[in-house]
Amino acid sequence: MEYRDWTKKDGSGRDISTSLLGYGCMRFPTLPDGRIDEVRAEKLLNTARAAGVNYFDTAFPYHGGESEPFVGRVIAKWPRESFYLATKLPLWSCKTLDEAKDIFEKQFERLGVDYIDFYLLHSLHKARYDAAKEMGIVDWLWEQKAAGRIRNFGFSCHDNAAGFEHILRDQPWDFCQLQYNYLDTDDRAEEIAGDRGYALTEELNVPLIIMEPIKGGTLAQLPPDAAAPLNALDAYASAASWALRWAASHKNVKVVLSGMSAEDQLDDNLATFGDFRPMTDAENAAIRQTADVLRSHIKIGCTGCRYCMPCPMGVDIPDNFSIWNKLGMFGNKDAIRQQWTACFPDAEKAIHCVRCGKCEAVCPQHLPIRDSLAKLQTELDNL
């Protein structure tokens, strides 16, 4: 396993050395009723740890609130100093400092730990950060670090480069977390800090954790024309391994998170980071070609984070977007028609959207969800 040493120590004075591959605990395998398949998920976590993964990232809302308790039950069996635990405060659920304190304490109960190695303000944009600061939440969490309950304090961000810079420069953050992959490099998109954001972390020497390196799985399944430049260099490398290597080859990156939901995904990622090879100039050129092709295919930049769920009308928004993106990327109309008509529950289809806007208010990507749902319903119905 490849590790990255940090130049700074944590709040306890301990040296930090994180596995370059981090386990994202948002996409565990699930049972038919939607609950975490705890037997399979625990095996995945134990396999990852045995292979050297030591960074595990969860959050209060993951898996409908069940990720933290499940992770807590698993890590209770491990020596506490053998891993780093990261979780996040959902500021959209905090209207007051007292509400933030209540969630913070509940997280410790769920996780069953005395301290949290990496604590983040979750899914920040400028307005959300400014509100949290005004409520005193940011200052209070620095106090928790001073008290030893948090060892590293940072934030995850879904904002453009200007919003990210506003947040990053405002505090002496121990680290930050950005969505960064070879498709999300252009900071002109509202929710993407992109290359400018990455460069700023280097400039300010703030260690970076990367989330969505495979863009919610999108970059693990490339259409032939997009895969061609990469296959010309290495016909045996998986599409996911290219995406992970691209992210991990940036020198300020300390952890690349991957939400592994199946054994083959974990095995492939462990192989990538067990014998890690930084990207060459030729490989980076091929990645740029692949990205150009993909940008012409994807219908909407949904990562499947499910922050928009549940929909009051029962629409499964990420699943609707997932099948729509498959149509755009792969163009297999027969397969998509079969999936849409025979397998996709009618009660969860986009047609039931009443344009209430609740989803758009919480989408970290700031996607035009309502208009896109209407468009996809028409396209899929007319296959």
Name the predicted role of every residue range.
Residues 5, 18-22, 54-55, 82-88, ...:
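Structural preference for beta-strand elements that scaffold enzyme active sites
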Residues 16, 47, 51, 110-111, ...:
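Structural motif
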Residues 24, 59-62, 119-122, 156, ...:
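Conserved residues at the C-terminal ends of beta-strands
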Residues 32, 92-209, 214, 221-228, ...:
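Glycine/proline-rich, positively charged
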Residues 49, 54, 73, 196-383:
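Structured C-terminal cap/extension of enzyme domains
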Residues 62, 66, 158-159, 261, ...:
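Short beta->alpha linker loops
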Residues 62, 78-97, 122:
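Structural motif corresponding to the early beta-alpha repeats
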